[in-house]
Amino acid sequence: MRVAAALERGVAFDRRRYVRHAVAIGGGLSANIRPATPIVVVDLSAGGCGIEIGIHVDVDTLVWLKLPGLESWPCRVAWSRDGRAGLTFDHPLHPAVVERFVAAGG
């Protein structure tokens, strides 16, 4: 029974649509009309990212991610705990944009 549960969990974790890349990109995150909060993107894919933010953000909140050289990008908070959060992009980033950040070392 434990093996079946582990296999099911493994399948669930493998369902991501986009490959995530470890990065370290300084940026900002804003919601509503508040000024941007400084963040560090720690992983990036075309469909979303993981960030270090230092504060709690409510799940399913519409936020705007600002990265160097890009316009603010609309996202939703997928999860938030211990000063970190996962964001899902409303529209995927072009793969060339992701590769640019990865090639630059994040």
Q: In which residue ranges do the predicted regions lie?
A:
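Short beta-strand-centered aromatic/proline hotspots
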Residues: 38-40, 74-78
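Short acidic/polar mixed-charge low-complexity motifs
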Residues: 35, 69-71, 83
